[in-house]
């Protein structure tokens, strides 16, 4: 994109794309860095910030560690019976090198499964599965991805994910992002209020989407 724009003497470049799951959102992706490089050459970069306001797609708060008496923070999303996504993506971002060490999933039927030591796809029964991945950016942002899938539509009801950090990490900032394959900026599966509310809440902080998270955007 950079050489294409330079060869054509571009003065302004407009991007109409916005993603909020599966990204570090800290300016370190290849596209974000390319935007910075083109901005440095004088090409104005215009990037949409997204439209996630009041969409229940973003959670922000404090992640406790496993020894915190307040317990883990529980995030949850709802799948409605009349609007079943085949895939729902959850991304949790923890800056400054902090990370999540405890992950426990509670399915709509109330059964629980530990995902703390998982890094691949797990069969959850009833056609549901979850794929777990972790990564770290060059700015030391840790990313946990959970991808829930069912070719016939995810089991309806409330899905809960309880999270905590390692012993001694204390309470640290985290954000959670949710998206699915049947909705866009709003609708579909969405976050429910996290618990306890003293640790985290649904809000609009951190709702700028990729690649508007580039340093120069």
Model-identified regions with their sequence ranges:
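Loop-rich non-cytosolic ectodomains and luminal regions
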Residues: 1-217
